[in-house]
Regions:
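Subunit-assembly interface segments of extracellular/virion macromolecular structures
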Residues: 1-203
Length: 203
């Protein structure tokens, strides 16, 4: 209904980091850098940190940050960090929106998924993974009966259906779509299909 725009970034700049700084494991505080601006010590190039990949949770050998460069540095010719720090990955991003899924209007928040960590020629189907769950009064106090103007913990109300939409990727050969809504298809780094139009007559 209010579709979040889907975008494909085939220049998702990656920077590998040393795992420690002055003997401290940087993964302990690395999450705090998301959204912050960092500057190369030698190149003086600045970039905004967008995403982080860790060997413990992602298919990478080294701690890697993904950045958007802001300037070209002191010499006005360099556009990426120096000293072999720079690599190129690929990603897909979805903006805030509302989708009509299984008879319900479901809100989706801005999400970014890394397609290939160190390659910009990915081949994937990108879309929304649909997950259904039930939320009861044990999970949300507001579901207790409040007919008298206050929460009555002795009278739990009805459970609620929760639908969660998560941006995910699937191989081109994976055609199992029971809980998947495709919105973007990429083959060898080329966009082959993109779903961007809202079809109100189907609602």
């Amino acid at each position: 209904v209010i579709p979040g725009n889907i975008t494909f970034d085939n220049r998702y700049n990656a920077v590998k980091l040393n795992p420690t700084n002055f003997g401290i494991d940087i993964s302990v505080y690395l999450e705090k850098f998301i959204g912050k601006t960092i500057t190369g010590k030698i190149s003086n190039i600045s970039a905004t940190v967008e995403k982080i990949a860790l060997p413990t949770t992602d298919p990478v050998d080294d701690i890697t940050i993904y950045v958007k460069y802001i300037n070209s540095g002191d010499d006005f010719s360099s556009s990426v960090f120096t000293d072999g720090e720079a690599l190129i990955g690929s990603a897909a991003s979805l903006g805030d929106g509302v989708f009509f899924i299984r008879g319900y209007f479901v809100k989706v928040t801005q999400q970014t998924i890394i397609l290939d960590y160190y390659s910009n020629n990915p081949s994937y189907r990108v879309g929304l993974q649909v997950t259904e769950s039930f939320i009861g009064s044990k999970d949300d106090d507001s579901l207790f009966d409040n007919a008298k103007g206050f929460t009555n913990f002795a009278a739990p109300g009805a459970d609620r259906l929760k639908i969660t939409l998560t941006l995910t990727k699937k191989l081109l050969t994976d055609l199992e779509d029971t809980d998947f809504v495709e919105i973007l298809r990429i083959d060898n780094g080329k966009v082959k299909k993109i779903k961007s139009k809202t079809r109100y007559n189907q609602i």
